[in-house]
Structures are given as C-alpha cells and as structure tokens.
Amino acid sequence: MTIMRKTHPLMKMVNHAFIDLPTPPNISGWWNFGSLLGLCLIIQILTGLFLSMHYTPDTLTAFSSVAHICRDVNYGWLIRYMHANGASLFFICLYFHIGRGIYYGSYMYKETWNIGIVLLFLVMATAFMGYVLPWGQMSFWGATVITNLLSAIPYIGSDLVEWIWGGFSVDKATLNRFFAFHFILPFIIAAMAMVHLLFLHETGSNNPLGIPSDSDKIPFHPYYSYKDLLGGAALLAFFFTIVLFFPDALGDPDNYTPANPLNTPPHIKPEWYFLFAYAILRSIPNKLGGVIALVLSILVLALFPFLHTSNQRSLTFRPISQTLFWILVSDLFILTWIGGQPVEPPFIIIGQIASILYFTIILILFPIAGMIENKMLKW
C-alpha cells in the first residue's frame, strides 16, 4: 500500500513542497530566511487579527483604542508590541533574503525573483499603511508626506492624491481605507508567497556554489525541516528579547503623541526599514525626480538577471564582485543613517553621494566586475 501523503490530493501537495522535496545537500543558513519570512507572516496575521478585534479605524478614537489595547486588554501590550516589532523582524529577514539572492545569483530564476520583487512592494505598502493606523504624529505626517509624493505625477497627480485621501487632506476616510487595505494585503502576500514557492519548486533551489546539484539531492524532511525549526527557534528568541526588553527601541517617540494636523513634527521620517529609500528620495532636489529615484531604488532589482555578465552564478569565487557587494551593503547602511538625519549639510551631500554610489554599483560596476573576472579566469 502506498503511503497516504503520496496519494491524498491535499497531502500530496504538502509532501511535494515540504517533505519529499529534492533539495541541494549544501545550502547554508542563508537559505533559512524564506521559511523565517513565512513564520513572520504568520505572526503578523495572527497578532494583527487580534489587534483588529479591539482597534477602531476612526480619527477620534484610533489613538485611544491602541492605548486601550495596551492598558485594558489581556496581554494586549504583548500583542501590540509583537505586531509592531514583527514588522521590523519581517524586514530584517526580507533584506537578508534579498541579499542572499544577490550574493548567490538566485536572481537567475527570473520568475521567482520577479514575484519576489512584487512581494517586496506589497510588504512595503502593507507596512506603510499599518504605520498610519495608530494615528500618532508620525502616522499622520508620514501618511501626508508619502501620499503627497503622488502629486508629482504629471497631469493626474493632484486628483490621484485627493482620490486616495478620500477628501482634501488625510482624514477619517483615509484612515478607514488604509485599515481595510492593511487587513487584506497580508492574505494577498500569503497567496503570492505560494506562487513564489511554486516557481521556485519548478527549478529547485540554488546553492552556495552556484552549480547544478540535480545529481546530488537530499529530501527536505528531516534534514531541512529540522534546520528550519532551529532557525525559527533562534528567530523567536531574538524576537521576544526585543519585544519583552526593548519594545520601543525601533519605534519613533513622536508616535506616542496623538495626531495633530496643526503641529508639524521637526523631523518627519518613516520607520527604520524605509530610511534608505527615503534618503534616495530626498537626495534629488526635484519632486518628480525624487519619486522616480525612490521607485527605481527597488525596481532596479528586476535588472539583476540582465546585468549578470559573469560565467559563474554566485559570488563565492569572485573576489572583485564580493568587494563590490559589501561596499553596496555598507552604502545601504549609510543611506539608512542619512534618512534619519535632518536635511542640512553635511548630510545632504553624503546622501547624494551614497545614492549615486548605490545605482552605480548595481548598474555599472557589477557588470564590469563580472567581465573582468571572466578575463582573469580566461573564460
């Protein structure tokens, strides 16, 4: 008799994806972040569901409903801080996951990579709308500034902004629709993640050497299922350390002040995970130019498969490209720091140099380095 997991229509799908899946024998800890992102998404959906039971999407009561959750609801403070810091954890895993993809050439699986870029945009949109919901000062002014960027779109810009706002400013209608979208998007993300996996399983996973491993595969379970459990345990240990000991370390103190349209905070800035893109946006003195640079800072990821000039897939044996990769990582740290600083010298010029370097490394230096390395290896 055949084992049920191999015959039952539903079990068969799970079996092919998580049990008998042929996996390269040498994938490292950097391959753990996909499953960790799944764990983050589950945490966010569950905590978000319980928060939504007590939250009211109304300008008059939103702020106090969050305070009520923290003060009066059983373990409400824990659910709220898990949700807020879960977003940060989500982006930490996301950036590691993308970095792994760039380093090891996983972007050569074009369909999987492009779905991943769509997922990144969806997660960014969800996080932005979620940040507006507590209706603190930074929520209100962040929503005002970021939605206002759409007014830079020629001809339809102003109408588009008012259409998104549902009025002539960020108000009750905006908060209400942001809550609706913030609730539905994680389920769309979950569906897209399944498509992401579907495309990945068409080709199989890449590995640190960047060479085919079809002749030497091992089953996902028990090897990688236990490895993922260990990764998940480590992630949860780190997560609860932040949530229980430093719950406000990653947030903005301004968001503990209720939203006031008559009082602008001295420094309007997004959450830390958007600061690199915010710095690129601010580094261009023209509004439309800044918006284009902002979108391109993420869309440029889609060009990686086309800019790949090396005859080797991964950076494992490519020292010049490795150096460029780590300069790019350092550059992103600099951009993140600049995004949180006021717009004044010397931060303006540092931000502009870092922004130029970001695009130069990806669009020009990576392809050149690949060609130089081919020449050095006489390929």
From Swiss-Prot:
UniProt-listed PROSITE patterns: CYTB_CTER, CYTB_NTER
Binding site residues for heme b b566: H97, H196
Cofactor(s) the record lists: heme b
Binding site for a ubiquinone: H201
Any one annotated GO CC term: mitochondrial inner membrane
GO biological process entries: mitochondrial electron transport, ubiquinol to cytochrome c
Membrane topology label: Multi-pass membrane protein
Transmembrane portions of the chain: 33-53, 77-98, 113-133, 178-198, 226-246, 288-308, 320-340, 347-367
Location of this chain's protein in the cell: Mitochondrion inner membrane
Pfam family, one: Cytochrome_B
Gene Ontology MF terms in the entry: metal ion binding; ubiquinol-cytochrome-c reductase activity
Main subcellular localisation: mitochondrion
Co-factor: note: Binds 2 heme b groups non-covalently.
Binding site for heme b b562: H83, H182
UniProtKB keywords: Electron transport, Heme, Iron, Membrane, Metal-binding, Mitochondrion, Mitochondrion inner membrane, Respiratory chain, Transmembrane, Transmembrane helix, Transport, Ubiquinone
Task performed by this protein: Component of the ubiquinol-cytochrome c reductase complex (complex III or cytochrome b-c1 complex) that is part of the mitochondrial respiratory chain. The b-c1 complex mediates electron transfer from ubiquinol to cytochrome c. Contributes to the generation of a proton gradient across the mitochondrial membrane that is then used for ATP synthesis.
Membership in a protein family: Belongs to the cytochrome b family.
Quaternary structure annotation from Swiss-Prot or TrEMBL: The cytochrome bc1 complex contains 11 subunits: 3 respiratory subunits (MT-CYB, CYC1 and UQCRFS1), 2 core proteins (UQCRC1 and UQCRC2) and 6 low-molecular weight proteins (UQCRH/QCR6, UQCRB/QCR7, UQCRQ/QCR8, UQCR10/QCR9, UQCR11/QCR10 and a cleavage product of UQCRFS1). This cytochrome bc1 complex then forms a dimer.
Further information: Heme 1 (or BL or b562) is low-potential and absorbs at about 562 nm, and heme 2 (or BH or b566) is high-potential and absorbs at about 566 nm.
UniProt cross-references to PANTHER family, sorted A to Z: CYTOCHROME B
Protein name per the record: Cytochrome b
Gene name of the record: MT-CYB
